[in-house]
């Protein structure tokens, strides 16, 4: 039996790039392993951090009697926030720390992220953050399930006033301290690059550095970028501080004593129950991106109505499969306030994933004309990310971004010039990347044709309305006014000179966020919100307080931080707060 790739693969390309027999390639919009080429060498299993490779061989499990362990603090989750929290807490207190990670390997979603450290004006991870998303591209269309498909405008930042301002301020300040702490680490200093920024020499860990996965040419996803570098750096500190890491060990319940304070954790590994007596818990267990029950409850439009819109492309989930919202059960088990009203998701698109970075970048440019399979535009392409929600309402939830040759060449030339660094180098090979996509014969990702008629036929786009839409779009480009969706004139590029390109796109998410509500010190509130649970802390995607529920399909996720920033800044702040508690 040959190896197979499981459906939750993130599409990071690492296994395909490292496969010695080139057995891994696209079939449709998913990576698959060719059984005729696979020699079952195990290289893909070795490099996959989320255990997405099914070897077909049953795992041997040795049942054991309940284990009894003891620690001062248990950290739940060995991703970015959890590993930062564990190391900082151990450094501050010298206490015994146990880290629980339910996956086979540490890292979580942060393993695939970027991350920057700097002592200069570029700022560090604690730099002021805003809602994630691309540039303002002008107003969106009507949007929402009632009004039909449209592109939502970027959110008014007044939503920040609804959030916990003291928590936001504390987390940002903690981010500055985290940045300074990392700059002084001996394990970090050899990787800092000295550059000139605004006339000043600064040391930075930049996205120009790829620490492993060197064959990658995709700037949109790790591993090997700053996110995995930070996590690896933290885990290398574990032996120094005596931190115990238990993988394949999922926390199931947080215990409290008669006063309501944390007293322990019940967990399970493949062999049985693990009971840990402790005084404190820091929860950094990730989002609920792979919990379909919670998604259906809070974000039902994440899933298509198969009767109304069959054979849809699923939303691509840029999140570890272990992101299943464990904090909900854990929080309820100990009487914490689970802030369901703030549950939200970040959707963006269209994205070209898991295909080439060149295609991904082309769709980020905003210069394309994007159509559904009926050949019609449906949103303002200049508002990067705003296409995600209206894609919900498009046939099969898939779209194509259309370029002519001068338009595509201009986008790539501009990207090479402005992106710089390693992403600029990736874009220099855009023609090679596109040819490799065409040669893969996946039947969906990219089509190139000499005429628009041929392009429509190849991509499965309804020809007559498509040709009418291109003519209408070109007319608006000449006028310099997008009469349909308000696209900025600078992004209005006519589709006139072949060969023509049709670049596949779909919806994606990097997380569904929310969980237990925390106070300005990352302490978790009790269910009555009249106080906190002594010894319980949370940070990152599973902690509420820095995000607001957008409200309806099509609205943007509203958050005061980027995801990775809230994870590591919050993890650092949690460690500082927990240290105060343990020293009492």
Model-derived segments and spans:
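Iron-sulfur cluster-binding cysteine motifs and their immediate structural context
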Residues: 10, 14-32, 43-59
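Conserved redox-cofactor binding core of oxidoreductases
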Residues: 175-272, 292-293, 349-351, 477-496
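Beta1/beta-strand and adjacent pyrophosphate-binding region of the FAD-binding site
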Residues: 65-81, 98
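Glycine-rich active-site loop/strand segments that organize a redox cofactor
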Residues: 116-183, 193
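Glycine-rich FAD pyrophosphate-binding loop
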Residues: 90-112
